[in-house]
Swiss-Prot record:
Belongs to the methylthiotransferase family. MiaB subfamily. GO terms for cellular component: cytosol. Its cofactor is [4Fe-4S] cluster. It comes from the Bacteria. [4Fe-4S] cluster 2 binds at residues 192, 196, 199. Catalyzes the methylthiolation of N6-(dimethylallyl)adenosine (i(6)A), leading to the formation of 2-methylthio-N6-(dimethylallyl)adenosine (ms(2)i(6)A) at position 37 in tRNAs that read codons beginning with uridine. Binds 2 [4Fe-4S] clusters. One cluster is coordinated with 3 cysteines and an exchangeable S-adenosyl-L-methionine. One of its GO terms (molecular function) is 4 iron, 4 sulfur cluster binding. Keywords: 4Fe-4S, Cytoplasm, Iron, Iron-sulfur, Metal-binding, S-adenosyl-L-methionine, Transferase, tRNA processing. This is tRNA-2-methylthio-N(6)-dimethylallyladenosine synthase. Residues 413-477 form the TRAM domain. It catalyses: N(6)-dimethylallyladenosine(37) in tRNA + (sulfur carrier)-SH + AH2 + 2 S-adenosyl-L-methionine = 2-methylsulfanyl-N(6)-dimethylallyladenosine(37) in tRNA + (sulfur carrier)-H + 5'-deoxyadenosine + L-methionine + A + S-adenosyl-L-homocysteine + 2 H(+). It comes from Acinetobacter baumannii (strain AYE). Monomer.
Amino acid sequence: MTVQTFIPNGAKAASENTVTQPTHTTDVSIKKLYIETQGCQMNEYDSHRMADLLGDSHGYVLTNNPNEADILLMNTCSIREKAQEKVFSELGRWRKLKEQNPDLVIGVGGCVASQEGDNIQKRAPYVDMIFGPQTLHRLPQMLDQHHAQVEKPKKEKIKLVDISFPDIEKFDFLPEPRVEGFKAFVSIMEGCSKYCSFCVVPYTRGEEVSRPLDDVLAEIAGLAEKGVREISLLGQNVNGYRGETFEGGICTFPELLRLVAEIPGIGRLRYTTSHPLEFSDELIQCYEDLPQMVSHLHLPVQSGSNDVLKAMKRNHTIDVYIDKIAKLRKIRPDMHLSSDFIIGFPGETDENFAETLQFIKDLDFDHSYSFVYSKRPGTPASDLPDTTPEHVKKERLAQVQQVIKQSSIEKTDAMLGKIERVLIEKVSDQDPNILVGTADNTRLVTFVGDASWVGRFAEIEITEIKTLNLVYGELLNLEPDVA
């Protein structure tokens, strides 16, 4: 599980997994909000929007210190059992803060809230508000309701739980997103209709619902006008996007990419998370036609064994996946590929695992999110017999991660002497003459340059490999501002 604590611009992050926010103030008269984000980039996006909502409606500013907050919000993830239990562990710590400050408001959102709203009320009755991913836009109203009934007797208080699955109305109530830096996430759809046997997402975020095309394009155009140069399109099954057009038609994901690429100012496009079934030839063609598309793709496969894929109800074979990647790499030979792997799925044999390990070697993955299978209540896979010892699963996982780590090291080393297109994001904290940016493949690139170049793209020749994710280079060409 990734835990991301929202911190203000200029503050030091406690870890790499942080998201910066508007400048923090020590003025005690200012109402302060602390958000802990667990899990995926969709949750990260949602947490940004929570901060925007409460900032606009009630004047809250973000703090990186839960001890000084007036509101504590936890945006939760239920993808694995360990992540779910960590929610209650953290809530136990927050309970102590509420005992010290009875006026403290505690809210729980995200997928655990959606799945276990009633259970949260029972196990943590001190939680004041519970809301799901599709109802976060109602946070200001829930907060008002909470304050309105603070003085009421306990038996007269209304339980503030809203974990329903309304249509994608939340985007109609969200304020204009704040811009921080030159990258931005844009959610284009919610939910998933694939119903893989191991996954809780359809039950916690609902069926697939796409945002209208015009809404998506308007949000991205607004971000570009504010200086954003890289857009990451988000969805649980993002390439299944089918947004309604103003004329009443349907826009597919490849068509959306082409329209976004036409927006002035947008110089780089990413997206996550995809499903192989909708990784179509039309989508692959975008990599040939649109220079804004990065040579980096996250395409979850989960297993390299057809038997396991069938049990997972992924509805495709390994050959289908391999064929799609072959087509893509014919267009982009330098394509960096990442994926998700579930190790130790019920019924996975030694032979099945060997197939997965060989598949990983053959496809030459650059990165992965790989975990031992975690049984999720209510999913079909939770009823499957699981006879593989836990220590065997962990040994298999270690093998997978070692193979992918070695591949990643080799890919970083191979950058030496090559030219990378880099989005310059900031001046180094250590040296005002050094600029820091990211390459298509997500590696950090540093080089000597002028602070006025921040926000532009540059061609950098890589001259030194520093670490797995950090390289040094020299400027070859500074591109004109794409705005």
